[in-house]
């Protein structure tokens, strides 16, 4: 196996999945390192996408070619337009998703993306050389090298 990539993304949450997908779509040989492939883009106890603030972010991600909105459409179990009693400028779409389906759909997207590879293991440390990040070392000592490392280690670290 070749352990050299253009970009390594550490963390398989929402940001990590979007970053890895975008990098690979732009032609970079990309590695996504995650602690658990069955929990890619895991949603919190309130599995909602959209709403007043988050809805704006989802629309911006969508405009940039991201997949969060599409994955939401594939895994949604209920949809509601918030603030319908106010003017149209205040309306805000929100979807409740099936938590497992959301993660499964993200995995399908990532596994079907060319130039994107997924490695399940804990990232332990950055490899530094010549005052520059050169890669990532995992908990079992596997060393991956790259031109850039994106850290999206998020909040679900337990």
Which role fits each region the language model picked out?
Residues 7, 29-31, 147-149:
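Beta-sheet entry/capping signal
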Residues 131-136:
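Short, hydrophobic/aromatic-rich segments at coil-to-beta transitions
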Residues 2-15:
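Beta1/beta-strand and adjacent pyrophosphate-binding region of the FAD-binding site
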Residues 2-5, 139-148:
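Core beta-strand elements of the Rossmann-like FAD/NAD(P) dinucleotide-binding domain
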Residues 21-125, 129, 140, 152-158:
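Conserved N-terminal/central alpha/beta ligand/cofactor-binding core
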């Amino acid at each position: 196996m070749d352990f050299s990539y253009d970009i390594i993304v550490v963390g398989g949450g929402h940001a990590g999945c979007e970053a890895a997908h975008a990098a690979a779509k732009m032609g970079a040989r990309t590695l996504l390192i995650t602690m658990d492939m069955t929990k890619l883009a895991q949603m919190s106890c309130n599995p909602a996408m959209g709403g007043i603030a988050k809805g704006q972010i989802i629309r911006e991600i969508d405009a940039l070619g991201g997949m969060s909105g599409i994955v939401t459409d594939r895994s949604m179990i209920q949809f509601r337009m918030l603030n319908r009693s106010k003017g149209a400028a205040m309306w805000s779409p929100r979807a409740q998703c099936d938590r497992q389906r959301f993660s499964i759909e993200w995995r399908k997207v990532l596994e079907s993306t060319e130039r994107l590879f997924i490695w399940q293991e804990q990232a332990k440390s950055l490899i530094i050389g010549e005052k520059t990040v050169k890669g990532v070392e995992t908990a079992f000592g596997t060393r991956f090298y790259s031109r850039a490392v994106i850290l999206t280690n998020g909040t679900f670290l337990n």
